[in-house]
């Protein structure tokens, strides 16, 4: 199995939430290989979702590095699907085309939106 991610000295903070200024997530070192199974276990608020958002490059770490070895642009190859469905508090259009925008697509969004609407019977 080839190395997919290297994580070193990763810290993510969401503002000062306690007098101790504890980070939401702290990872000294983590290596993830292609095809490897990985289970994240922890209490609510322990940083599991934060780590996934960082690995999907949806957020930036406050400290440390995430090195992705899978290809040139991880935002085109990595996605995150959460267990609970979530809609942004915006328009249906923006929710439907969000994935395309995150991957850098700017052209043809209206056509993609219309095709998606037809696919689910909203034509």
Model-derived regions, located:
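Short beta-strand immediately N-terminal to the Walker A/P-loop
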Residues: 38-39, 80
């Amino acid at each position: 199995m080839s190395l997919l991610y290297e994580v070193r000295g990763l810290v993510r903070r969401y503002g000062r939430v306690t007098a101790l200024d504890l980070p939401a997530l702290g990872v000294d070192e983590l290596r993830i290989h292609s095809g490897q199974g990985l289970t994240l276990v922890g209490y609510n608020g322990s940083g599991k979702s934060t780590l996934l958002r960082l690995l999907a490059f949806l957020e930036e770490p406050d400290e440390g590095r995430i090195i992705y070895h899978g290809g040139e642009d991880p935002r085109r190859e990595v996605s995150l699907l959460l267990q609970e469905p979530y809609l942004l508090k915006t328009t249906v259009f923006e929710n439907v085309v969000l994935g395309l925008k995150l991957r850098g697509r700017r052209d043809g969004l209206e056509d993609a939106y219309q095709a998606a609407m037809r696919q689910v019977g909203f034509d």
